[in-house]
């Protein structure tokens, strides 16, 4: 076969593999290709200004949700919920939205710093995928999440825009994780959140929940005993996403204990890049906990 033909065939095969790999992931493996989308913020404020002219009219359906990006579509289930729900929240919290307006319009200033976390992750985890980051305005119930469309950041919740790179980093790690099927146990969910905090901190320099960290370190023994007794169940109360305030405990102690598990696993590892891979691709969470050595004296 002529050498030129061989070269053309090789190039074609490489293109097929490249396109196939990109299609399977849906997103690029290059941090430079990730989009940071803030256009939904402008759409929200247009709807908000029109709403203020006549508060009996719900402008958020036609002017925001219907014309929003994939980020708005992805943030709607379980967060924005519906145009009617957003309308009712804005009516009740109109002044709160007004107070954060200036901050939301400055979010694009943090794109360069946020993208730097993507480069840092690429170094630690070459298999990382980099989806779009959508900054949207929601119903004051979520600071961020990730989904099949990408990363979604609730702009109205970001009272300090300097914290945005840390939020983006946390959600970026969630996007890379292998998630367990069904309803995750308290152990699984705590490890998932803790690993997003741990690796997110590595790539952004942003520290996690100070209140949970301080409380956890002060009451560690009691919390370890309680966690071990509950970790195989799916009741997150007093550990994740809410608290009864018993013992004056703060929210999200599961993040704290998950972080500790990950930190111990990483510290024990001789191959740090392999450890990052292991953390993002956990198959057996009980085995992972045992390998970390954390909580050994509490496990029976």
Tell me what each language-model feature is.
Residues 1-28:
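Bacterial Sec-dependent N-terminal signal peptides
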Residues 24-83:
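N-terminal mature-domain "stem" immediately C-terminal to a signal peptide or N-terminal signal-anchor/transmembrane
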Residues 26-48, 187-230, 295:
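Post-HExxH zinc-binding segment in Zn-dependent metallohydrolases
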Residues 41, 45, 115-118, 193, ...:
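Extracytoplasmic/secreted envelope proteins and their assembly/folding machinery
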Residues 44-54, 63, 67, 120-127, ...:
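Structured segments of extracytoplasmic/periplasmic soluble domains
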Residues 59-64, 68, 228-300:
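Pan-zinc metallopeptidase signature
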Residues 84-213:
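Acidic/His-rich structured neighborhood in mature extracellular/periplasmic domains
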Residues 140-143, 216-222, 282-287:
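Amphipathic alpha-helical surface "interface" segments used
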């Amino acid at each position: 076969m002529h050498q030129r033909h061989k070269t053309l065939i090789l190039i074609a095969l490489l293109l097929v593999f490249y396109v196939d790999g990109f299609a399977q992931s849906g997103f690029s493996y290059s941090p430079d290709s990730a989009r940071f989308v803030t256009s939904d913020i402008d759409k929200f404020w247009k709807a908000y200004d029109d709403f203020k002219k006549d508060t009996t009219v719900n402008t958020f359906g036609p002017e925001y949700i219907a014309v929003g990006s994939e980020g708005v579509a992805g943030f709607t289930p379980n967060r924005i919920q519906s145009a009617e729900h957003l309308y009712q929240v804005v009516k009740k919290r109109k002044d709160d939205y007004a107070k954060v307006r200036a901050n939301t319009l400055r979010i694009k200033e943090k794109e360069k710093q946020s993208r730097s976390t993507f480069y840092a992750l690429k170094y630690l985890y070459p298999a990382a995928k980099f989806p779009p980051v959508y900054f949207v305005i929601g119903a004051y119930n979520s600071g961020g999440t990730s989904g099949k469309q990408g990363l979604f950041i609730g702009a109205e919740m970001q009272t300090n825009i300097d914290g945005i790179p840390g939020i983006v980093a946390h959600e970026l790690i969630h996007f890379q994780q292998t998630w367990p099927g069904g309803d995750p146990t308290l152990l699984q969910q705590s490890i998932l959140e803790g690993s997003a905090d741990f690796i997110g901190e590595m790539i952004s320099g942003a520290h996690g929940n100070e209140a949970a960290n301080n409380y956890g370190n002060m009451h560690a023994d009691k919390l370890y005993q309680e966690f071990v007794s509950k970790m195989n169940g799916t009741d997150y109360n007093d550990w994740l996403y809410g608290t009864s305030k018993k013992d004056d405990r703060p929210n999200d102690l599961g993040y704290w204990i998950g972080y500790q598990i990950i930190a111990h696993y990483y510290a024990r590892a001789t191959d740090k890049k392999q450890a990052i891979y292991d953390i993002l691709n956990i198959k057996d969470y009980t085995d992972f906990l045992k390998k970390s050595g954390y909580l050994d004296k509490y496990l029976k």
